[in-house]
C-alpha cells in the first residue's frame, strides 16, 4: 500500500500535491451535492471518496506516519461509526 502511495507522490510531484488534493476534494464535494439533489451514484461517490482518501494517506506518509498508525486509527473510527449507526446515533434529529 505504501509503495502505491509513493508512486502517486512521484507522479504528481511535490508542487502539485496540494492542488491535486484540492481538486479531488472539489470533485468529492460536487459528487456529494449531486447525491442530495439527484440521488446517489454509488460508483462515482465511491471513486471520488477513494481518490481523496488515497491522497490524504499520501500526506500522512509524507509526514512520517507509518501504515500501522494509520490503519489503527482508521479501524478505531470505523468501529465508532458502525457502533453509532447500530445504536441509532445517526437517526436522531439535529
Name the predicted role of every residue range.
Residues 1-94:
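Flexible "arm" and connector segments at domain edges
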Amino acid at each position: 500500500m505504501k509503495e502505491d502511495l509513493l508512486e502517486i507522490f512521484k507522479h504528481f510531484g511535490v508542487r502539485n500535491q496540494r492542488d491535486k488534493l484540492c481538486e479531488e476534494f472539489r470533485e468529492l464535494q460536487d459528487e456529494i451535492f449531486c447525491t442530495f439533489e439527484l440521488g446517489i451514484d454509488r460508483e462515482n461517490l465511491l471513486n471520488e471518496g477513494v481518490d481523496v482518501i488515497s491522497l490524504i494517506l499520501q500526506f500522512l506518509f509524507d509526514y512520517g506516519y507509518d501504515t500501522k498508525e494509520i490503519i489503527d486509527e482508521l479501524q478505531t473510527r470505523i468501529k465508532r461509526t458502525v457502533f453509532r449507526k447500530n445504536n441509532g446515533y445517526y437517526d436522531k434529529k439535529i
